[in-house]
Amino acid sequence: MIDCLSEVYSSHENIWGPFDIDLERGFFNEETVGEFIDAYFEHTVRPRSRIVLKSLFNLETTSAHLLLTIFLLGANFGPSEGAKSQATRRLDMAEYAVFENPTFLQLVYNQQPRTSDSLNQTEIESIQAAVLIILIQLASPKADARRRVRIQRYPALVSVARATSLTQVRNRWHDPTVPLNHANFLKNETCIRLMASITMLDCHNIMFLNTPPQFTVTEFGFDLPAEEKGIDLGDSATWEIWAQNEREYQRPSPLNRFIQELLSDDWPGLEDPKYSNLNVFTLFVVVSGKHPTPQFLASMLK
């Protein structure tokens, strides 16, 4: 993590003050790494909306950029005000490190069409890191950081989502004609949750920052996140039992078709088994996909 910050500092020395390697080692030590990563998983996200599954997280193999963003997010929302202040001072450097990471830049400027199936773990983690650092920086007290995220970083993330076909990612684990494959499910589910989070960021920017939509509703050909009902998706044994049970129900359509069904005169309601597994997170994704304005939401609440 220190190397990530050191590398980006050497490219932008004019932006920040002196880089004190001893100070960084004091902050990124063995004790704080464990504490703040635990804080991320326990206090900053709900299980159903996690884009990084705790049971699959491995400190030894996770990329430094994703580890850095998880660490800073955990520190920023942990109980220690001192740690929060220390983390805040490093957020801009972390943002530059994530978005200037060569792996992420290759995805941004990729000239060849790709599918989400072709993404490797390092590439997925670079996208996860980008989503997380945007989430942190949207709440930055500094106007320049919020503006940079709005006009530069989020559009880059949208470009990656389109270039890698995250907008079309499907998870066919519920299809009885497709053999159950735990590894494929986890990869697809991670990509689906990433795209769901990117969609919700678009909704946030429309509602609170008055920006135009980056996507059209017809682009949202991705499945909704799975309803895990408190099980550990990372455990292959419990997952297979859960998946077999879930196959008794129909899954909702991809988001773009789901929105069409929701707004049609033939909408059967939530009593239909096809929609019985929706949770709060998936409903937020559906509303986000509609590109709501404050006026639209107000009309829904009347």
Question: What is each PLM-predicted segment?
Answer:
Residues M1-S63, T69, L73, M93-N110, ...:
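Intrinsically disordered, low-complexity activation-like regions
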Residues G78-S85, D144-R146:
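Structural helix-adjacent loops and short alpha-helical linkers that scaffold large soluble proteins
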Residues A87-D92:
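Beta-propeller domains
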Residues N188:
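Histidine/cysteine- and/or acidic
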